[in-house]
């Protein structure tokens, strides 16, 4: 689907909202940016992709996640069928003062509540390994 300008604004807001929800520890609000059946693929950090809002919330609530998230450089593009793609960059501040940078590749679907991320794949760009 080719996104309209209005779609692009809403999708950019949805992608950026992820960082606010994470940093506010408002995991009960994940449904504002993810679909019920969302896939969070952070396998670059080890482990398997996590599927579904409840499982993603539990995973994000576990120790070891970044303390601050900053989403930038959001680019929205056409996706297959009813989907739209977004690519953004993330800067995360880690416990102990470290920094990590990532690229997020998102698939988004329009729901009754607006655009939501149905799949997020994370690519670590710095450091090279965790």
Segment roles from a protein language model:
Residues 1-24, 28, 32, 36:
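Short, low-complexity N-terminal intrinsically disordered segments enriched in polar/charged residues
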Residues 2-3, 15, 41, 61, ...:
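Residue-level detector of alpha-helix boundaries and kinks
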Residues 4-7, 45, 49, 97:
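Alpha-helix initiation/capping motif
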